[in-house]
Amino acid sequence: MTKPIITFNNVSKTFEDSGTQVLKNINFDLEEGKFYTLLGASGSGKSTILNIMAGLLDASSGDIYLDGERINDLPINKRDIHTVFQNYALFPHMTVFENVAFALKLKKVDKKEIAKRVKETLKMVQLEGYENRSIQKLSGGQRQRVAIARAIINQPRVVLLDEPLSALDLKLRTEMQYELRELQQRLGITFVFVTHDQEEALAMSDWVFVMNEGEIVQSGTPVDIYDEPINHFVANFIGESNIINGTMIEDYLVSFNGKEFESVDGGMRPNEPVEVVIRPEDLQITLPEEGKLQVKVDTQLFRGVHYEIIAYDELGNEWMIHSTRKAIEGEVIGLDFTPEDLHIMRLNETEEEFDARIEEYVEMDESEDGLINAIEEERNEENL
């Protein structure tokens, strides 16, 4: 990893008036030029992290570093960080030009330089020619672009975005996701984005921090977070999941619904209780006799790109299936899946415990492979 641009070291936050602890020992390093997302439900602590990073809130304990310099006591205007707020915080009585140029005027930048940089920045956010437009006459998407232009005109090291797309309609929000991601990659500025929208986080980010009750419960690439959730909360929060109680018989063999199935997971105790995750899109509908499981279709909804089918097995477990084929309500169908479609989770395992287990398991696996290779080499020498 390259030198981090921002570091949180055991950062906690408790509001003194209520005694409520909203952050618990937050630790992370952010690299320069990447798109990070803090993802969580309302009250999870994600906006508190953003406000501490910006200097709008003080941490109760722990250290915050920018480029290796401790900034806990550094004033907001001394931090090379800019925030785009949910309500955009634009000046309604000013024009687009005046809003974007505001920070440069405070720094007493030359008028010609201001005009040049405002024009360049508005072009970046596709608002060229809007310089004299009143803020009050702009659409929601246009106001969003003005707020972003104002944030990047000073070329800060870090841009913080506090749910800036939440007020936009679905189509415009999707368009802005593409624009924000493309802009961040073009500028090479570190973006830290806050959202409760899982699809938004997965679509835009290089790295996602999933938060719950003031803690980071899992962090990783969008693919890691989606394909390898470490516990029930993450699996249930990120996308749709079928989560079934099971037993890990041994490495690569799991039991649930009274049957044994091959898997690709290992490193757990023999006969350890586990939870099995199968994503709805990984379940294939078959004839009942051809399926690994049999379920009875209860209801279905057409979602445009697929049917969302709810079915129940004989044990009463609910199954969600995404299929391009329409099912018949009341019909018994088979469900097929591969070992790779099963993700096995230990009960209540933390990210630290998960990482330690995987590291130990990989080392053990490599050691066994080395022993097998040594035995085979010895046999080959004896045969010569």
Curated annotation (Swiss-Prot):
Annotated binding of ATP, by residue: G40, A41, S42, G43, S44, G45, K46, S47
EC number: 7.6.2.11
A Pfam entry, by short name: TOBE_2
Keyword Cell cycle among UniProt keywords: no
Catalytic activity: ATP + H2O + polyamine-[polyamine-binding protein]Side 1 = ADP + phosphate + polyamineSide 2 + [polyamine-binding protein]Side 1
Record-annotated ABC transporter domain positions: 6-238
Source domain of life: Bacteria
Catalytic EC class: translocase
A Gene Ontology molecular function term of the record: ATP hydrolysis activity
Keyword field: ATP-binding, Cell membrane, Membrane, Nucleotide-binding, Translocase, Transport
GO cellular component: ATP-binding cassette (ABC) transporter complex
Subcellular location, record wording: Cell membrane
Main location as per UniProt: membrane
Bilayer disposition of the protein: Peripheral membrane protein
Role according to the record: Part of the ABC transporter complex PotABCD involved in spermidine/putrescine import. Responsible for energy coupling to the transport system.
Oligomer and partners: The complex is composed of two ATP-binding proteins (PotA), two transmembrane proteins (PotB and PotC) and a solute-binding protein (PotD).
Similarity comment: family membership: Belongs to the ABC transporter superfamily. Spermidine/putrescine importer (TC 3.A.1.11.1) family.
Record-given protein name: Spermidine/putrescine import ATP-binding protein PotA
Organism (species): Streptococcus pyogenes serotype M6 (strain ATCC BAA-946 / MGAS10394)
